[in-house]
Amino acid sequence: MLRTRLIQAASSAQRAFSTSQKALAAKQMTVRDALNSALDDELARDDRVFILGEEVAQYDGAYKVSRGLWKKYGDKRVIDTPITEMGFAGIAVGAAMAGLRPVCEFMTWNFSMQAIDHIINSAAKTFYMSAGAVNVPIVFRGPNGAASGVAAQHSQCFAAWYAHCPGLKVLSPYDAEDARGLLKSAIRDPDPVVFLENELVYGTAFPVADNVADKDFLVPIGKAKVMRPGKDITLVAHSKAVETSLLAAAELAKKGIEAEVINLRSIRPLDTATIFASVRKTHHLVTVENGWPQHGVGAEICARIMEDQTFFELDAPVWRCAGVDVPMPYAKTLEAHALPRVQDLVEATLKVLGGKVGKAAAANK
């Protein structure tokens, strides 16, 4: 029943979206269309690529990410599966070992717990255990993290979970450019990739450059992007927390504080070079994520800073702005308070800057 509710909720919550061809002709692109067009490109480019998962074919996907692809490519390239994540993830990993390039969709990453043995013990470790003889070129993708009103068992962020495991690459796109370019790179990659999308931005349209529509447009794995330059403090985020960071940076600008916002894009490998370069410039850092704080992505960034000479560039301790350390509440008001808000991030920034707030504002006038 819960899966049925998720499908119905996804269907009713959809904003207007177009086919791949229309999306690629636009100056703006939704994340849903970006993912759809990336899948279309790679299915057309390489006949080893195929998609499998629950409702991905005739229903066009629970969130319509695979819309039109079953009609275009048929039953052998876009495959509906039974409700058994362990079963179809195992099929996908075996197919990858045999030389195909599966894209395995989870209706939500929370359901990947049913398939975690195949992801961690089979996909991630086979290249190492075979001494490099067997690649596992597979993409596991689907919505990750907090959605809206789906409570504790369907709102977890798995970025830190999977980034802990050697042998996996873990990507967390934010906007349409990220989604299209990173998914194409993931499908072409020789290693298993965990691709963590966010349901809440599927229908959001982002401005895109003309080259994003190119068939070979790729976003490199392991490279972060500076979304907003600044000189007073660095805000490092991934997925929807990038939006929170950009909004907070706009509020901070009203106070005369210039925050630099970094979109990680890639959780493993982690682009420490971009983070370190920014911290050497701003001398202050706040990490932002919707996942839990303990052993999270922000905690790893803090550790990397501590282990590098960049630590000596800090003028104040690093601050983590993360989800509250509790299972996600169902009540809407409590749910809103369980995730970092713009005001939370503004307050964290002011605490890190401390007495330098007035000086920064004066210097930036």
Swiss-Prot record:
E.C. designation(s): 1.2.4.1
Compartments it resides in: Mitochondrion matrix
Disruption-associated phenotype: RNAi-mediated knockdown in neurons reduces life span of adult flies and results in locomotor defects at both larval and adult stages accompanied by abnormal morphology of motor neuron terminals at neuromuscular junctions and mitochondrial fragmentation in brains. RNAi-mediated knockdown in eye disks induces morphologically aberrant rough eye phenotype in adults and aberrant photoreceptor axon targeting.
Highest taxon in the source lineage: Eukaryota
GO molecular function: metal ion binding; pyruvate dehydrogenase (acetyl-transferring) activity
Enzyme's top EC category: oxidoreductase
Cofactor (UniProt): thiamine diphosphate
Catalytic activity: N(6)-[(R)-lipoyl]-L-lysyl-[protein] + pyruvate + H(+) = N(6)-[(R)-S(8)-acetyldihydrolipoyl]-L-lysyl-[protein] + CO2
Location, primary (coarse class): mitochondrion
Residues the record lists as binding thiamine diphosphate: 85
One Gene Ontology cellular component: mitochondrial matrix
Keyword Oxidoreductase: yes
Alphabetic keyword roster: Metal-binding, Mitochondrion, Oxidoreductase, Potassium, Pyruvate, Thiamine pyrophosphate, Transit peptide
Gene3D superfamilies assigned to the protein according to its UniProt record, in alphabetical order: 3.40.50.920, 3.40.50.970
Expressing tissues: Expressed in salivary glands (at protein level).
SMART domains recorded: Transket_pyr
Transit peptide region: 1-24
Gene Ontology biological process terms in this record: pyruvate decarboxylation to acetyl-CoA
Residues given in the record as K(+) binding sites: 138, 186-187, 189
Keyword Chaperone: no
Function: The pyruvate dehydrogenase complex catalyzes the overall conversion of pyruvate to acetyl-CoA and CO(2). Might play a role in regulating synapse structure formation at neuromuscular junctions. Might play a role in maintenance of mitochondrial morphology.
Protein name from the UniProt record: Pyruvate dehydrogenase E1 component subunit beta, mitochondrial
Source species of the chain: Drosophila melanogaster (Fruit fly)
Gene: Pdhb
